[in-house]
Each structure stands twice: as structure tokens, then as C-alpha cells.
Amino acid sequence: MSLLDYFKSKKKPSTAVMAKERLQIIVAHQRGQRDTPDYFPQMKQEIIAVIRKYVQISDDQVSVQLDQNDDNLSVLELNVTLPDR
């Protein structure tokens, strides 16, 4: 193996591969949102409003997800990035 072969083997993924991966992420995200209840967006905004009473945060610092298992079990996951004091 020559030195040139070593550098040629580390090619960046093509733009088509990157676009395909991004599209798969978007489709998976939309499929996850399709099964959410009608009240979910309003509940998310109300939770953010309560947190804002105590801490200054922006919408991108809060992640709310509703996961549903096959066992008829729903899990509400809330992740908040709190600012430093």
C-alpha cells in the first residue's frame, strides 16, 4: 500500500449519501410526530411557560417527546438545558 492509497481511502461521503441520511432523519421524526395526541402541542407550550416563570430559556433549550410502546404505555420525556447561574 503506497502513501497515496492511504489518503485516497479516506474520502468524504458524497452529497447524495449525506442528503439520504438527512432525509431518513426527517422522515423518522415526522413518523414519530404523526402518532401524537391533539393536545400535545398545547401541553408542550404550557410546560415551557411554567419553566419560564422560574428560568429564562428559549424554545430550542427544551425538548419534549412522547414515546409510545407496544404495551400501550406512553412516556413523556422532557429535556431542559438550564443556563449557568
Swiss-Prot record:
UniProt-listed GO biological process terms: division septum site selection; regulation of division septum assembly
Entry keyword Cell cycle: yes
Signal sequence, renumbered to the chain: none
Family matches, as Pfam families: MinE (PF03776)
InterPro entries, A to Z: MinE, MinE_sf
Domain of life: Bacteria
Presence of the UniProt keyword Calcium in the record: no
Keywords: Cell cycle, Cell division
Assigned GO CC terms: plasma membrane
Purpose: Prevents the cell division inhibition by proteins MinC and MinD at internal division sites while permitting inhibition at polar sites. This ensures cell division at the proper site by restricting the formation of a division septum at the midpoint of the long axis of the cell.
Family: Belongs to the MinE family.
Protein name in the entry: Cell division topological specificity factor
Organism listed in the record: Shewanella oneidensis (strain ATCC 700550 / JCM 31522 / CIP 106686 / LMG 19005 / NCIMB 14063 / MR-1)
The gene coding this protein: minE
